[in-house]
Every structure is written in structure tokens, then in C-alpha cells.
Design a protein with these regions (language model features):
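Periplasmic solute-binding protein
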Residues: 1, 24-30, 101-110
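Short glycine-enriched loops at secondary-structure junctions
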Residues: 1, 19-21, 88-92, 149
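Bilobed "Venus flytrap"/periplasmic-binding protein-like clamshell domains
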Residues: 5-78
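Short helix-loop capping/hinge motifs at secondary-structure junctions, enriched
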Residues: 2-7, 35-38, 111-120
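Pocket-lining segment of extracytoplasmic ligand-binding domains
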Residues: 45, 52-145
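Flexible glycine/proline-enriched surface loops and loop-helix/loop-strand junctions
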Residues: 10-12, 105, 164-165
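An extracytoplasmic/periplasmic, membrane-proximal ligand-sensing/linker region
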Residues: 76-77, 139-166
Length: 166
């Protein structure tokens, strides 16, 4: 209960996923902006996946982790007393960089996009509709998330959805 934000991670071992990818770059940037040298002031143990990070959280009551949603919510359901200290989006926004964290994008091959502009436009419109649907129909969306194996339980998906920043 001594952690209140990223600035409190100095001196701790922190478990995280996403080494050599966007999660690592975001974590390092936020830590550095909060006056923490990620190579000297704490130890980041990079886990192969969120399941590995969860095992450390279960073993050590003092463990800290930086986890993506919806896995953070799923972990809280499995580890008594586990809580979210700070949302990375909030930590990023507090830095007032004028930018947002982007962790996912839609990509298409240039030749396909140029040959199929109507299909691309239709996809983007339907994608936007699905985002609105998900935000407005959390319970139904959570049931689909469970059905398609994205998250094991609809209840966890529903609880995590508001924090997923879709």
C-alpha cells in the first residue's frame, strides 16, 4: 500500500511484459519523466507473458507489476489485495506531452488499400461502430469477449472494459 504512482517505483522490482516493444518504451519514458532511471533506480523483470507476471504477484505480497488491461483486472480477481495504483494513460497524460499513448493501430498493405478503398472505408466505419457498441453495451460486449476467448470470464471483461481505453 506504499505505492501511489510511478514515482514510487524507485527501489522496487517491477514485473512487466512487452520488452523491446511499445510497452517497454512507454514504461521507460514515463519512469524517466518522473525522475526514475529505469536502468539504475529499480529493477524491471521482463516476463514472457502476463501469466508469468501473475505468478510473481501470487508469490510475493510486495511485488509490483505493470500490466495491460484486461489482464490487470483479471489479476486483481486472482490476487487478494492487488490494486491498480496508476493507469499508464493517466501517467502519460500527466506529463502533458500533447500526445496520447498509442498501443494499437490498423494496418493494410498499400496495394490492397489503393485497390479496395470502399472495403477500407467500410471496415473503418464498422470498426468505429463496434467501438461505440462496446462502450454502450458493456455486458453484451463482455459476453462476446468471453465467447471468443479473449478473456476467460465475461465478468472480468465487463469490469475491465472502462479501463481499456478503446
Amino acid at each position: 500500500d506504499t505505492l501511489t504512482g510511478m514515482q514510487d517505483l524507485a527501489g522496487h522490482t517491477v514485473y512487466a511484459t512487452g520488452q523491446s516493444a511499445v510497452p517497454e518504451y512507454v514504461i521507460r519514458y514515463i519512469l524517466t519523466a518522473n525522475g526514475i532511471d529505469p536502468d539504475k533506480d529499480l529493477e524491471i523483470k521482463w516476463c514472457a507473458d502476463t501469466t508469468e507476471a501473475l505468478s510473481y504477484l501470487k508469490e510475493d505480497a510486495d511485488a509490483a507489476a505493470i500490466l495491460p488491461q484486461p489482464f490487470a483486472t483479471a489479476a486483481m480477481a486472482q490476487v487478494e489485495g492487488l490494486r491498480i495504483v496508476q493507469d499508464l494513460n493517466d501517467a502519460w497524460n500527466a506529463l502533458d506531452t500533447g500526445s496520447e499513448i498509442t498501443t494499437g493501430v490498423i494496418v493494410a498493405r498499400k496495394d490492397f488499400a489503393e485497390a479496395n478503398p470502399e472495403a477500407i472505408e467500410k471496415f473503418l466505419l464498422e470498426y468505429a461502430d463496434s467501438v461505440v457498441y462496446t462502450e454502450e453495451n458493456a455486458a453484451d460486449s463482455a459476453a462476446l469477449i468471453e465467447k471468443y476467448g479473449i478473456v476467460a470470464k465475461a465478468a472480468i471483461a465487463e469490469k475491465a472494459l472502462p479501463d481499456c481505453h478503446i
